[in-house]
Amino acid sequence: MEQVDLAIIGGGISGVAVAQCAAAAGYSVVLLEKSTLAAGTSSQSSKLIHGGLRYLESGQLDLVRESLRARRELLRLAPTLVKAVPFFIPVYRDSRRGALTLRAGLSLYGLLSEFDRLGRFRSLPARAWGSFPGLKLAGMTHMFQYWDAQTDDALLTKAVADSARLLGADIREGAECLTIEHEPQGCKLSYRDADGDKMLHCRFLVNAAGAFVNELLARVTPPIAQTAIDWVQGSHLLLDIPAPPGVLYLESCFDERVVFVMPWYGKTLIGTTETLCQGPVPQITREEIAYLLGIYRHYFGGSGSFTGAVTTEALEAKVLAHFSGMRVLPKGDGDAFGRPREVQLYQRYSHPRLLTLYGGKLTTFRATAKAVTAEISKVLGKRSPKADVDKLMLG
């Protein structure tokens, strides 16, 4: 039977990042992905590398600080994949978040970024408010501009996987884990690929299956306790409208949430929603489409991309594509808006050779991978490192 130090289940950004970090630390690594790399949420996110300005409202300062540090690192390590982008926040007379609140929030955002090169913001003069064609100017009192970053999430995931491969990690696509037998010295896995059923023994196993994390735990013997989760779907629409000159940070006209209008390969991308779902497979709903188009129409009711007033039918005709990513959040009451977004690492006393990742953010994947690798080293001991992940360029 094949023997390795570490097996990872899941080929999203978290899984490939753990593969890279662990391989750099000197461990032998096999990653099993039942489909293709970045087939799930890691290709269906909002494409942003950002601190999460809105998380300040729920007091998640540590998460914002960590995310801003991660943003700085990725701009350095992946300059061809992660690009600084201007963000714009229009403020209207009826906005829930007034100019003073936003100025305070942006000041704190800059402080938490340690005033790096993207940590500054400014209030734009009224003559600059028309830089977004068709954006509603009636009732606007301020427009703030700050900086964050954008990426192609699928390409970034594949770049991390390529780096892991160069370090010796064996990444296998089309390989579905079927059973997991936890033993005192590791885990015995059965999996299926194009050549049939196979077996693998690892000294440590990381469950990075994303939305399917508990489904994978159900295949473990002896049985292991699962953490209660909610599946929260984030949907996006790609519109056949010329890309805006930056990212617009807009208050929803329907609730307290924030929605982004973003440039994406020359077109306009709008998202995201937060819809509680009953299962791990995302599927955009008519309500989500109406929600996103309604917000766009509220702010761009006289867009220069249309003749006359913007109707719902005209906007629907502009939809080129849609996609939905699935988040895993701690189970709770009410909507998902204020729930914690930090990744959770679970390692049960009954199953010390198995670590499960719940949640995670695209921006902070490197910090997650380092934390997981530190847990691996506590069980397996340290190896002679092959590389310093803080110096490995991506892309």
Identify the residue ranges that each predicted region occupies.
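Core beta-strand elements of the Rossmann-like FAD/NAD(P) dinucleotide-binding domain
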Residues: E2-V4, D195-F204
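Flavin (primarily FAD) binding-site architecture
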Residues: N207-P222
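Dinucleotide-binding Rossmann-like beta1-alpha1 core, especially the glycine-rich loop
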Residues: K47-P133
